[in-house]
């Protein structure tokens, strides 16, 4: 994370203006600029565990990870620099949360790539911190305003839910498949047979759909779920609770905080980090699975058919098989054997 994103490069064009500022950085933080930016003081609040991992190493307690920011997360800040995400409801949740905590008169800066929809910030903040565009470069926009009115923020109002057969799925802004079951997960679910037993790890659990569905026909399964996203972790906990399913749910950057071995690892791994394309998580998942599968344990993932996962599976496990496919997606299966590269 040493190279700066285009959004950060636009901010650096104005770095002299921030030397006396006490800044809170938030939003879609994709680099370590908050730790390297010259200012009177800098803090970070992020909902992404992998971003917190990096920034906390550089900033210590000044970097915070949670679903909702609290007053002590923004203490003494007189400036907000918000990186616009690709997901508008996610931006709404985060900005309303943070603006409800900051004092009137706080300088508000919003920066993001044009393709992320950063222009939407003007309308979203019109009643609270009217924005003006102050720079346009690197296919990004930078907006500035001052906080004139604090919004009232109630996290409970952002919860949503939908049903899959007899299951209730709880969701929050920023969670994958927030509005319904995605086609890839649906294909993976179709391959999970009833009466599965043993310990199952759901990596990148999102709203907890895969685990809740698996538990509905395999009640003896022991579930562990993890995700880098704070909204996903909370949504998965709520989904399990809504369906009377037990399981451990926690934040982890793929396997970073996972302990022990499992009989099955299931995942619909992301190939986007924010608006950037990234295969890192899936490759880390495949390579790392050998250290978290019992002998004879199985890795089962769904992915877009065009992604180069067969090669990585073969290099790591020695083989793979495709057990279901559509025109767009494939479900890959491989098994932990002696030939797997530990």
From Swiss-Prot:
GO terms for cellular component: cytoplasm. It holds the Pfam family MTS. Keywords: Cytoplasm, Methyltransferase, rRNA processing, S-adenosyl-L-methionine, Transferase. SUPFAM superfamilies: S-adenosyl-L-methionine-dependent methyltransferases (SSF53335). Coiled coil: none annotated. The keyword RNA-binding does not apply. It comes from the Bacteria. Its EC number is 2.1.1.172. InterPro entries: DNA_methylase_N6_adenine_CS, Mtase_sm_N, rRNA_ssu_MeTfrase_C, RsmC/RlmG, SAM-dependent_MTases_sf, Small_mtfrase_dom. It catalyses: guanosine(1207) in 16S rRNA + S-adenosyl-L-methionine = N(2)-methylguanosine(1207) in 16S rRNA + S-adenosyl-L-homocysteine + H(+). It is found in: Cytoplasm. The keyword Ligase does not apply. GO terms for molecular function: 16S rRNA (guanine(1207)-N(2))-methyltransferase activity; nucleic acid binding. Specifically methylates the guanine in position 1207 of 16S rRNA in the 30S particle. Monomer. Belongs to the methyltransferase superfamily. RsmC family. This is Ribosomal RNA small subunit methyltransferase C. The lineage of its organism: Bacteria, Pseudomonadati, Pseudomonadota, Gammaproteobacteria, Enterobacterales.
């Amino acid at each position: 994370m040493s190279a700066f994103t285009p959004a950060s490069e636009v901010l650096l064009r104005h770095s002299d203006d921030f030397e006396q500022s006490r800044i809170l950085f938030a939003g879609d933080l994709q680099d370590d600029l908050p730790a390297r930016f010259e200012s009177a003081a800098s803090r970070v609040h992020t909902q992404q565990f992998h971003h917190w991992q990096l920034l906390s190493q550089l900033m210590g307690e000044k970097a915070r990870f949670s679903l909702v920011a609290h007053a002590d997360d923004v203490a003494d800040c007189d400036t907000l620099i918000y990186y616009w995400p690709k997901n508008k409801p996610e931006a709404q949740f985060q900005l309303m949360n943070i603006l409800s905590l900051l004092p009137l008169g706080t300088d508000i800066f919003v920066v993001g790539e044009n393709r992320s929809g950063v222009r939407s910030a003007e309308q979203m903040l019109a009643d609270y911190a009217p924005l003006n565009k102050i720079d346009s470069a690197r296919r990004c926009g930078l907006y500035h305003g001052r906080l004139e009115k604090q919004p009232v923020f109630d996290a409970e109002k952002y919860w949503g839910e939908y049903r899959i057969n007899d299951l209730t799925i709880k969701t929050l802004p920023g969670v994958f498949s927030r509005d319904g079951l995605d086609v890839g997960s649906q294909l993976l679910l179709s391959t999970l047979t009833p009466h599965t037993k043993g310990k199952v790890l759901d990596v990148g659990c999102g709203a907890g759909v895969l685990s809740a569905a698996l538990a509905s026909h395999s009640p003896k399964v022991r579930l562990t779920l993890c995700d880098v996203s704070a909204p996903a972790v909370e949504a998965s906990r709520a989904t399990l609770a809504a369906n009377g399913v037990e399981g451990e749910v926690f934040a982890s950057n793929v396997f970073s905080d996972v302990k022990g071995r499992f009989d099955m690892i299931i995942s619909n791994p992301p190939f986007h980090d924010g608006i950037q394309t990234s295969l890192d998580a899936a490759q880390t998942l495949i390579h790392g699975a050998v250290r978290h599968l019992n002998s004879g344990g199985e890795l089962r993932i769904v992915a877009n058919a065009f992604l180069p996962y067969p090669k990585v599976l073969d290099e790591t496990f020695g083989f793979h098989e495709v057990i279901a496919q559509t025109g767009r997606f494939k479900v890959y299966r491989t098994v932990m054997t002696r030939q797997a590269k530990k």
